[in-house]
Amino acid sequence: MEKRIRALKAIILVVVMIVELFGVDAVRVVAETINVTGDTTISTEDNRDYAVTDCTLTVSSTGNITGTVFGSGGTIVNQGSIGKIDGNIKVDNQAGASIQDLQSSVDITNAGYITSATYSSTYTLTNSGTIDTLNVNNPGFSDSAATVNMNAGTISSLNVKNHTGTNPVINYAGGTITSLTAEGTNGADLVVSGSHEISQLKGTVNVSGSGMLTVSGVLQLEKGYTGENLGVTKDTVLTVKDGNTIKVNYNDHTYSISSATEQKITELAGNTVKAVMDDAATMTAETPFTLETYMYGEQATAVYMANDDYYFPEDYTATVTVGRGTLDITRINAKKINLAYTFKDENTGVEISLPAATAKTTQDAPTGLTGGIEKVTGVTTAMEYAGSKTSDTWT
Protein backbone atom coordinates (compact mmCIF):
# COMPACT_ATOMS: atom_id res chain seq x y z
CA MET A 1 0.00 0.00 0.00
CA GLU A 2 2.84 2.34 0.92
CA LYS A 3 4.44 1.76 -2.50
CA ARG A 4 1.16 2.59 -4.24
CA ILE A 5 0.85 5.82 -2.25
CA ARG A 6 4.40 6.79 -3.20
CA ALA A 7 3.68 6.02 -6.86
CA LEU A 8 0.49 8.09 -6.77
CA LYS A 9 2.37 10.98 -5.16
CA ALA A 10 4.98 10.73 -7.91
CA ILE A 11 2.30 10.90 -10.60
CA ILE A 12 0.69 13.90 -8.94
CA LEU A 13 4.07 15.60 -8.67
CA VAL A 14 4.74 15.04 -12.37
CA VAL A 15 1.33 16.47 -13.30
CA VAL A 16 1.93 19.52 -11.10
CA MET A 17 5.35 20.09 -12.70
CA ILE A 18 3.88 19.82 -16.23
CA VAL A 19 1.12 22.28 -15.40
CA GLU A 20 3.61 24.72 -13.89
CA LEU A 21 5.93 24.46 -16.89
CA PHE A 22 3.46 24.26 -19.79
CA GLY A 23 0.04 25.17 -18.44
CA VAL A 24 -3.13 23.17 -18.10
CA ASP A 25 -3.44 22.69 -21.89
CA ALA A 26 -0.49 20.31 -21.70
CA VAL A 27 -2.57 17.86 -19.68
CA ARG A 28 -5.08 16.23 -22.00
CA VAL A 29 -7.78 13.85 -21.03
CA VAL A 30 -8.68 11.50 -23.85
CA ALA A 31 -12.45 11.02 -23.94
CA GLU A 32 -14.04 7.69 -24.63
CA THR A 33 -15.17 6.99 -28.22
CA ILE A 34 -18.69 5.59 -28.44
CA ASN A 35 -19.35 3.14 -31.26
CA VAL A 36 -22.83 3.57 -32.72
CA THR A 37 -24.16 0.71 -34.83
CA GLY A 38 -27.88 1.24 -34.30
CA ASP A 39 -30.13 4.28 -34.57
CA THR A 40 -29.38 6.56 -31.62
CA THR A 41 -30.57 9.95 -30.33
CA ILE A 42 -28.48 12.37 -28.24
CA SER A 43 -30.52 14.88 -26.22
CA THR A 44 -27.96 16.23 -23.71
CA GLU A 45 -24.53 17.83 -23.74
CA ASP A 46 -21.88 15.22 -24.43
CA ASN A 47 -18.11 15.73 -24.77
CA ARG A 48 -17.40 12.22 -26.04
CA ASP A 49 -16.50 11.22 -29.59
CA TYR A 50 -18.85 9.03 -31.60
CA ALA A 51 -18.12 6.54 -34.37
CA VAL A 52 -21.24 5.95 -36.48
CA THR A 53 -21.45 2.93 -38.78
CA ASP A 54 -24.36 2.34 -41.18
CA CYS A 55 -27.07 3.81 -38.96
CA THR A 56 -28.67 7.14 -38.01
CA LEU A 57 -27.37 9.35 -35.22
CA THR A 58 -29.87 12.07 -34.29
CA VAL A 59 -28.84 15.06 -32.19
CA SER A 60 -32.05 16.62 -30.88
CA SER A 61 -32.63 20.34 -30.36
CA THR A 62 -31.40 19.97 -26.76
CA GLY A 63 -28.39 17.86 -27.73
CA ASN A 64 -24.82 19.17 -27.94
CA ILE A 65 -21.90 16.95 -28.96
CA THR A 66 -18.74 18.94 -28.28
CA GLY A 67 -16.49 16.15 -29.50
CA THR A 68 -16.13 14.62 -32.98
CA VAL A 69 -18.56 12.37 -34.81
CA PHE A 70 -16.76 9.97 -37.15
CA GLY A 71 -18.82 8.43 -39.92
CA SER A 72 -18.59 5.26 -41.95
CA GLY A 73 -21.91 4.99 -43.73
CA GLY A 74 -25.22 6.07 -42.28
CA THR A 75 -26.70 9.49 -41.56
CA ILE A 76 -26.38 12.29 -39.02
CA VAL A 77 -29.56 14.27 -38.39
CA ASN A 78 -28.61 17.39 -36.47
CA GLN A 79 -31.23 19.51 -34.74
CA GLY A 80 -28.89 20.77 -32.02
CA SER A 81 -25.14 21.39 -32.00
CA ILE A 82 -22.11 19.33 -33.09
CA GLY A 83 -18.46 20.32 -32.73
CA LYS A 84 -17.03 18.32 -35.64
CA ILE A 85 -18.13 15.73 -38.19
CA ASP A 86 -15.56 13.71 -40.12
CA GLY A 87 -15.88 10.81 -42.55
CA ASN A 88 -18.14 9.22 -45.14
CA ILE A 89 -21.56 9.96 -43.76
CA LYS A 90 -24.65 11.81 -44.91
CA VAL A 91 -25.43 14.99 -43.00
CA ASP A 92 -28.82 16.65 -42.54
CA ASN A 93 -28.20 19.90 -40.66
CA GLN A 94 -31.68 21.20 -39.99
CA ALA A 95 -32.97 24.74 -39.37
CA GLY A 96 -31.75 26.09 -36.04
CA ALA A 97 -28.92 23.54 -35.79
CA SER A 98 -25.19 24.28 -35.95
CA ILE A 99 -21.95 22.49 -36.88
CA GLN A 100 -18.56 24.02 -36.16
CA ASP A 101 -16.39 21.90 -38.48
CA LEU A 102 -17.71 19.58 -41.19
CA GLN A 103 -15.40 17.22 -43.09
CA SER A 104 -17.65 14.97 -45.15
CA SER A 105 -17.50 13.27 -48.51
CA VAL A 106 -21.15 12.21 -48.84
CA ASP A 107 -24.41 14.11 -49.37
CA ILE A 108 -24.93 17.22 -47.24
CA THR A 109 -28.16 19.15 -46.71
CA ASN A 110 -27.88 22.37 -44.74
CA ALA A 111 -30.74 24.53 -43.53
CA GLY A 112 -28.96 25.58 -40.35
CA TYR A 113 -25.54 27.07 -39.65
CA ILE A 114 -22.09 25.66 -40.51
CA THR A 115 -18.95 27.56 -39.54
CA SER A 116 -16.57 25.67 -41.84
CA ALA A 117 -17.12 22.80 -44.28
CA THR A 118 -14.66 20.91 -46.48
CA TYR A 119 -16.33 18.77 -49.11
CA SER A 120 -14.32 16.23 -51.12
CA SER A 121 -16.95 14.26 -52.92
CA THR A 122 -18.79 13.33 -56.07
CA TYR A 123 -22.11 13.81 -54.27
CA THR A 124 -24.34 16.84 -53.71
CA LEU A 125 -24.36 19.61 -51.13
CA THR A 126 -27.65 21.51 -50.97
CA ASN A 127 -27.70 24.77 -49.04
CA SER A 128 -30.58 26.90 -47.83
CA GLY A 129 -28.96 27.95 -44.57
CA THR A 130 -25.70 29.70 -43.68
CA ILE A 131 -22.14 28.52 -44.34
CA ASP A 132 -19.28 30.82 -43.42
CA THR A 133 -16.59 28.94 -45.40
CA LEU A 134 -17.13 26.11 -47.87
CA ASN A 135 -14.13 24.37 -49.44
CA VAL A 136 -14.90 22.03 -52.35
CA ASN A 137 -12.06 19.73 -53.41
CA ASN A 138 -12.31 17.57 -56.52
CA PRO A 139 -11.04 14.07 -55.71
CA GLY A 140 -9.84 13.75 -59.31
CA PHE A 141 -12.45 11.53 -60.92
CA SER A 142 -12.85 12.02 -64.66
CA ASP A 143 -16.53 11.07 -64.87
CA SER A 144 -18.10 12.71 -61.80
CA ALA A 145 -17.60 15.63 -59.44
CA ALA A 146 -19.18 17.46 -56.54
CA THR A 147 -22.36 19.49 -57.02
CA VAL A 148 -23.32 22.47 -54.87
CA ASN A 149 -26.97 23.51 -55.09
CA MET A 150 -27.31 27.05 -53.79
CA ASN A 151 -31.06 27.45 -53.32
CA ALA A 152 -31.27 30.02 -50.53
CA GLY A 153 -29.35 31.30 -47.54
CA THR A 154 -25.75 32.48 -47.56
CA ILE A 155 -22.28 31.16 -48.35
CA SER A 156 -19.75 33.82 -47.39
CA SER A 157 -16.66 32.20 -48.92
CA LEU A 158 -16.81 29.37 -51.49
CA ASN A 159 -13.41 27.97 -52.52
CA VAL A 160 -12.91 25.29 -55.17
CA LYS A 161 -9.71 23.33 -55.84
CA ASN A 162 -9.68 21.29 -59.04
CA HIS A 163 -6.44 20.51 -60.82
CA THR A 164 -7.58 17.33 -62.59
CA GLY A 165 -10.86 15.63 -63.31
CA THR A 166 -14.40 16.81 -63.90
CA ASN A 167 -15.28 20.32 -62.78
CA PRO A 168 -17.41 20.72 -59.65
CA VAL A 169 -20.76 22.29 -60.54
CA ILE A 170 -22.24 25.18 -58.58
CA ASN A 171 -25.92 25.76 -59.34
CA TYR A 172 -26.65 29.32 -58.23
CA ALA A 173 -30.43 29.60 -58.05
CA GLY A 174 -31.05 31.57 -54.88
CA GLY A 175 -29.54 33.12 -51.79
CA THR A 176 -26.20 34.92 -51.68
CA ILE A 177 -22.66 33.77 -52.42
CA THR A 178 -20.35 36.56 -51.29
CA SER A 179 -17.08 35.25 -52.72
CA LEU A 180 -16.19 32.44 -55.15
CA THR A 181 -12.58 31.49 -55.88
CA ALA A 182 -11.62 28.52 -58.07
CA GLU A 183 -8.03 27.25 -58.10
CA GLY A 184 -6.48 24.76 -60.48
CA THR A 185 -6.29 24.09 -64.18
CA ASN A 186 -9.92 23.03 -64.56
CA GLY A 187 -11.62 25.13 -61.89
CA ALA A 188 -15.39 25.15 -61.46
CA ASP A 189 -18.58 25.43 -63.51
CA LEU A 190 -20.96 28.11 -62.23
CA VAL A 191 -24.51 27.77 -63.58
CA VAL A 192 -26.61 30.87 -62.90
CA SER A 193 -30.40 31.06 -62.95
CA GLY A 194 -32.10 34.29 -62.00
CA SER A 195 -30.37 37.56 -61.14
CA HIS A 196 -27.75 37.50 -58.40
CA GLU A 197 -24.90 39.62 -57.08
CA ILE A 198 -21.51 38.44 -55.87
CA SER A 199 -18.77 40.54 -54.33
CA GLN A 200 -15.77 38.58 -55.63
CA LEU A 201 -15.30 36.14 -58.53
CA LYS A 202 -11.75 34.90 -59.04
CA GLY A 203 -9.85 32.09 -60.73
CA THR A 204 -10.85 29.49 -63.30
CA VAL A 205 -14.63 29.83 -63.30
CA ASN A 206 -16.78 28.85 -66.28
CA VAL A 207 -20.01 30.85 -66.09
CA SER A 208 -23.16 29.70 -67.90
CA GLY A 209 -26.91 29.41 -67.43
CA SER A 210 -29.95 31.56 -68.11
CA GLY A 211 -29.45 34.24 -65.46
CA MET A 212 -27.23 37.25 -64.78
CA LEU A 213 -24.48 37.39 -62.17
CA THR A 214 -23.35 40.91 -61.28
CA VAL A 215 -19.88 41.17 -59.74
CA SER A 216 -19.80 44.20 -57.46
CA GLY A 217 -16.26 43.99 -56.06
CA VAL A 218 -13.45 42.05 -57.77
CA LEU A 219 -13.61 40.19 -61.10
CA GLN A 220 -10.42 38.30 -61.91
CA LEU A 221 -10.78 35.32 -64.25
CA GLU A 222 -7.90 33.12 -65.34
CA LYS A 223 -9.47 32.44 -68.73
CA GLY A 224 -11.53 34.35 -71.27
CA TYR A 225 -15.31 34.61 -71.17
CA THR A 226 -17.62 35.38 -74.09
CA GLY A 227 -21.04 34.51 -72.64
CA GLU A 228 -23.87 36.81 -71.59
CA ASN A 229 -24.14 36.03 -67.87
CA LEU A 230 -21.64 38.41 -66.26
CA GLY A 231 -22.43 41.96 -65.19
CA VAL A 232 -20.38 44.64 -63.42
CA THR A 233 -20.96 47.91 -61.59
CA LYS A 234 -19.02 51.17 -61.73
CA ASP A 235 -17.11 50.00 -58.64
CA THR A 236 -16.09 46.56 -59.95
CA VAL A 237 -12.31 46.11 -60.19
CA LEU A 238 -11.42 44.02 -63.26
CA THR A 239 -8.25 42.11 -64.09
CA VAL A 240 -8.00 40.43 -67.50
CA LYS A 241 -4.84 38.61 -68.54
CA ASP A 242 -3.23 39.65 -71.80
CA GLY A 243 -4.45 37.43 -74.62
CA ASN A 244 -7.82 36.84 -72.98
CA THR A 245 -11.11 38.62 -73.60
CA ILE A 246 -14.07 38.77 -71.27
CA LYS A 247 -17.51 40.14 -72.01
CA VAL A 248 -19.34 41.99 -69.26
CA ASN A 249 -22.65 43.78 -69.12
CA TYR A 250 -23.09 47.23 -67.65
CA ASN A 251 -26.27 49.28 -67.92
CA ASP A 252 -27.72 46.92 -70.58
CA HIS A 253 -24.67 47.23 -72.83
CA THR A 254 -22.03 44.54 -73.41
CA TYR A 255 -18.35 45.46 -73.30
CA SER A 256 -15.46 43.31 -74.53
CA ILE A 257 -12.39 43.80 -72.34
CA SER A 258 -9.12 42.41 -73.67
CA SER A 259 -6.65 43.70 -71.09
CA ALA A 260 -7.09 45.13 -67.61
CA THR A 261 -5.09 45.37 -64.41
CA GLU A 262 -7.24 46.23 -61.42
CA GLN A 263 -9.26 48.76 -63.40
CA LYS A 264 -12.89 49.79 -63.36
CA ILE A 265 -15.20 49.72 -66.36
CA THR A 266 -15.29 53.52 -66.37
CA GLU A 267 -11.51 53.56 -66.83
CA LEU A 268 -11.57 50.91 -69.55
CA ALA A 269 -14.55 52.05 -71.63
CA GLY A 270 -15.71 55.39 -70.26
CA ASN A 271 -16.25 58.56 -72.32
CA THR A 272 -15.81 62.29 -71.85
CA VAL A 273 -17.50 65.15 -73.69
CA LYS A 274 -16.72 68.79 -74.35
CA ALA A 275 -18.22 71.57 -76.45
CA VAL A 276 -15.99 73.79 -78.58
CA MET A 277 -17.34 77.26 -79.40
CA ASP A 278 -16.51 78.61 -82.84
CA ASP A 279 -16.67 82.15 -81.44
CA ALA A 280 -16.57 82.49 -77.66
CA ALA A 281 -17.42 86.19 -77.96
CA THR A 282 -20.98 85.32 -78.96
CA MET A 283 -21.97 82.92 -76.17
CA THR A 284 -21.19 81.75 -72.65
CA ALA A 285 -21.53 78.33 -70.98
CA GLU A 286 -24.04 78.79 -68.18
CA THR A 287 -23.81 75.09 -67.23
CA PRO A 288 -20.99 73.38 -69.15
CA PHE A 289 -20.59 69.63 -69.64
CA THR A 290 -19.09 68.10 -66.50
CA LEU A 291 -15.66 66.47 -66.47
CA GLU A 292 -17.02 63.12 -65.24
CA THR A 293 -16.80 59.86 -67.18
CA TYR A 294 -19.94 58.69 -68.97
CA MET A 295 -20.84 55.20 -70.12
CA TYR A 296 -22.73 53.91 -73.14
CA GLY A 297 -26.40 54.89 -72.90
CA GLU A 298 -25.86 57.69 -70.39
CA GLN A 299 -26.63 61.34 -71.15
CA ALA A 300 -24.68 64.55 -70.58
CA THR A 301 -26.32 67.99 -70.65
CA ALA A 302 -25.13 71.59 -70.90
CA VAL A 303 -26.74 75.04 -71.13
CA TYR A 304 -25.36 77.94 -73.21
CA MET A 305 -26.37 81.62 -73.16
CA ALA A 306 -26.06 84.05 -76.05
CA ASN A 307 -24.08 87.14 -75.10
CA ASP A 308 -25.48 90.67 -75.36
CA ASP A 309 -26.36 91.69 -78.91
CA TYR A 310 -26.53 88.01 -79.97
CA TYR A 311 -29.25 85.37 -80.12
CA PHE A 312 -29.82 81.76 -81.14
CA PRO A 313 -32.03 81.50 -84.23
CA GLU A 314 -34.81 78.93 -84.29
CA ASP A 315 -32.89 76.75 -86.73
CA TYR A 316 -29.67 76.79 -84.67
CA THR A 317 -27.72 73.53 -85.00
CA ALA A 318 -24.50 72.09 -83.62
CA THR A 319 -22.28 69.29 -84.94
CA VAL A 320 -20.80 66.22 -83.25
CA THR A 321 -17.27 66.22 -84.66
CA VAL A 322 -16.00 63.26 -82.59
CA GLY A 323 -18.42 60.58 -81.38
CA ARG A 324 -21.23 58.30 -82.50
CA GLY A 325 -23.95 59.36 -80.09
CA THR A 326 -26.98 61.56 -80.64
CA LEU A 327 -27.19 65.29 -79.87
CA ASP A 328 -30.49 66.99 -79.07
CA ILE A 329 -30.69 70.81 -79.01
CA THR A 330 -33.58 72.53 -77.26
CA ARG A 331 -33.99 76.27 -77.91
CA ILE A 332 -35.41 77.52 -74.62
CA ASN A 333 -35.62 81.07 -76.01
CA ALA A 334 -33.61 83.37 -78.21
CA LYS A 335 -30.96 83.73 -75.49
CA LYS A 336 -30.65 80.17 -74.20
CA ILE A 337 -30.16 76.64 -75.59
CA ASN A 338 -29.92 73.25 -73.90
CA LEU A 339 -27.61 70.50 -75.25
CA ALA A 340 -28.23 66.82 -74.44
CA TYR A 341 -25.77 64.21 -75.74
CA THR A 342 -26.63 60.50 -75.42
CA PHE A 343 -23.54 58.31 -75.63
CA LYS A 344 -23.26 55.44 -78.06
CA ASP A 345 -19.53 55.34 -77.58
CA GLU A 346 -16.79 53.45 -75.75
CA ASN A 347 -13.53 55.00 -74.58
CA THR A 348 -14.09 58.16 -76.64
CA GLY A 349 -13.44 61.83 -76.06
CA VAL A 350 -16.60 63.26 -77.63
CA GLU A 351 -16.40 66.76 -79.13
CA ILE A 352 -19.29 69.02 -80.13
CA SER A 353 -18.81 72.09 -82.32
CA LEU A 354 -21.02 75.10 -81.49
CA PRO A 355 -21.39 77.66 -84.31
CA ALA A 356 -21.37 81.30 -83.28
CA ALA A 357 -24.62 82.85 -82.11
CA THR A 358 -26.22 85.32 -84.55
CA ALA A 359 -25.66 89.04 -84.11
CA LYS A 360 -28.79 91.14 -83.65
CA THR A 361 -29.45 93.77 -86.34
CA THR A 362 -31.09 97.21 -85.89
CA GLN A 363 -33.73 98.31 -88.38
CA ASP A 364 -33.07 101.64 -90.09
CA ALA A 365 -35.35 104.49 -89.09
CA PRO A 366 -38.28 104.94 -91.48
CA THR A 367 -37.92 107.67 -94.10
CA GLY A 368 -40.38 109.58 -96.26
CA LEU A 369 -42.93 110.12 -93.53
CA THR A 370 -45.37 112.93 -94.34
CA GLY A 371 -48.31 114.51 -92.62
CA GLY A 372 -47.15 113.56 -89.16
CA ILE A 373 -48.17 109.94 -89.68
CA GLU A 374 -45.59 107.77 -87.92
CA LYS A 375 -45.95 104.32 -89.35
CA VAL A 376 -43.91 101.83 -91.25
CA THR A 377 -45.26 100.40 -94.44
CA GLY A 378 -44.64 96.90 -95.65
CA VAL A 379 -45.06 95.22 -92.24
CA THR A 380 -46.29 91.62 -92.41
CA THR A 381 -47.57 89.17 -89.81
CA ALA A 382 -44.38 87.09 -90.19
CA MET A 383 -42.29 89.88 -88.68
CA GLU A 384 -41.44 90.09 -84.96
CA TYR A 385 -40.15 92.86 -82.76
CA ALA A 386 -38.61 93.06 -79.28
CA GLY A 387 -39.64 95.58 -76.65
CA SER A 388 -36.01 96.40 -75.85
CA LYS A 389 -32.47 95.41 -76.73
CA THR A 390 -32.27 93.06 -73.74
CA SER A 391 -35.69 91.47 -74.13
CA ASP A 392 -35.80 87.66 -74.16
CA THR A 393 -39.13 87.57 -75.97
CA TRP A 394 -40.13 88.72 -79.42
CA THR A 395 -43.64 89.70 -80.57
Region spans (language model):
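Surface-exposed interfaces of beta-sheet-rich extracellular modules
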Residues: 227-229, 253, 301-332
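Short proline/glycine-enriched turn/loop motifs at strand-loop junctions of beta-rich domains
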Residues: 307-313, 376-384
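Bacterial N-terminal signal peptides that target proteins for export
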Residues: 1-12
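Sec-dependent signal peptide cleavage junction
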Residues: 21-33
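Bacterial N-terminal signal peptides
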Residues: 11-23
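Extended beta-solenoid/beta-helix repeat architectures
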Residues: 31-269, 367
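Extracellular ectodomain segments of secreted/surface proteins
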Residues: 268-296, 352-375
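Extracellular interaction modules
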Residues: 12, 251-254, 259-267, 332-355
